């Protein structure tokens, strides 16, 4: 726990490590935090922003935007629903039009197949795939991945993830397919999914 706490270096966040074979949680850290043997006064808690959320266990109760990890959900859906996926190539210029707007990448990846798109974490390719797959398919794979589930950790229920994909525009669905837009996932659920 100490190494995880130090790695967070005062930033707000959570770290969890578990044995994927047994489900045993080996490490669970949430910051900000304080020494329970020397707690801050009520006045310090109120006046010092460093303690904001100190009573919240972000690993259990928090939800966060998953970011590019969610591309693995979009990829799983595409593998099973896009028959010519492995024969396609895309050209990333750093900005891809999806619906009525742009989905941007920090780099222009050039021409790439699905392997390169995953390796490069190309927002444009995964946004196009998300749009092609549609709301229902992405919602089904998100649920299959367990990202909307609440898990029990020693009898304490985690927050459930939230992926409201109904009625999105093509551009919004594209951003959701790369783990942005209004996607929210609990760190424990993400840990279980990736394990």
Regions found by a protein language model. Give the residues of each.
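Conserved, well-ordered alpha-helix/loop/beta-strand core segments that scaffold catalytic motifs
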Residues: 1-14
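Beta-lactam-recognizing serine transpeptidase/beta-lactamase-like catalytic domain environment
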Residues: 20-68, 73-195
């Amino acid at each position: 726990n100490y190494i995880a706490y130090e790695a967070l270096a005062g930033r707000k966040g959570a770290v969890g490590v578990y044995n994927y074979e047994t489900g045993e949680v080996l490490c669970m850290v949430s910051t900000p935090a304080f020494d329970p043997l020397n707690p801050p006064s009520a006045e310090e808690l109120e006046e010092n922003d460093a303690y904001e959320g100190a009573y919240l266990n972000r690993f259990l109760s928090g939800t966060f935007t998953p970011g590019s990890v969610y591309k693995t959900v979009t990829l799983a859906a595409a593998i099973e629903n896009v028959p010519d996926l492995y024969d396609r190539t895309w050209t990333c210029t750093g900005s891809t039009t999806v619906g009525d707007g742009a989905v941007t990448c920090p780099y222009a990846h050039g021409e790439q197949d699905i392997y390169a798109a995953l390796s490069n974490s190309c927002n444009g390719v995964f946004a196009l795939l998300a749009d092609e797959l549609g709301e229902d398919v992405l919602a089904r794979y998100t649920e299959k991945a367990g990202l909307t589930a609440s898990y029990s950790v020693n009898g304490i229920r985690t927050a459930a993830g939230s992926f409201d994909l109904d009625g999105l525009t093509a551009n919004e669905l594209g951003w959701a397919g790369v783990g942005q837009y209004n996607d929210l996932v609990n760190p424990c659920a993400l840990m279980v999914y990736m394990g």
